[in-house]
Amino acid sequence: MSMMKEFREFAMRGNVVDLAVGVIIGAAFGKIVSSFVADIIMPPLGLLIGGVDFKQFHLVLREAQGAVPAVVMNYGSFIQTIFDFVIVAFAIFLAIKLMNKVRRKQEEAPAAPPAPTAEEKLLTEIRDLLSQQQQPKL
């Protein structure tokens, strides 16, 4: 088997394709959540706090000296990233909760009783014949 054929079989397996689709959708969802947090959630939150832009929160560790830029810890961006994470984690939690609910409903559905085996059918016939023989003849 050639290496290309093996690779094609590997790449076209259901799990690999599903994983690739999940990664692509996850990346797009991450961008949507980042925009939602940065453009929708943080501005009103900053306004409630007093017109603050969280991205501008920083701590200067060392001032700029000539051509050397200042060393700055941007904790405002970190706070915004935490909001991103919490929203993504909550969305994943809701999705998994929904999937588990659907799975439980499928498991709760009663399974059809199994068809009688050949042995059970034969025993049923024998029982019926014996009961017919024991009935009084009219």
UniProtKB/Swiss-Prot annotation:
Regions crossing the membrane: 10-30, 76-96
Topology relative to the membrane: Multi-pass membrane protein
Subunit record text: Homopentamer.
Location (main, coarse): membrane
Function: Channel that opens in response to stretch forces in the membrane lipid bilayer. May participate in the regulation of osmotic pressure changes within the cell.
Disulfide bridge partners, by residue number: none
Family: Belongs to the MscL family.
UniProt protein name: Large-conductance mechanosensitive channel
SUPFAM superfamilies: Gated mechanosensitive channel
This protein's UniProt keywords: Cell inner membrane, Cell membrane, Ion channel, Ion transport, Membrane, Transmembrane, Transmembrane helix, Transport
Record flagged with keyword Transmembrane helix: yes
PROSITE patterns on file: MSCL (PS01327)
Species this protein is from: Serratia proteamaculans (strain 568)
UniProt cross-references to Gene3D superfamilies, sorted A to Z: Large-conductance mechanosensitive channel, MscL, domain 1
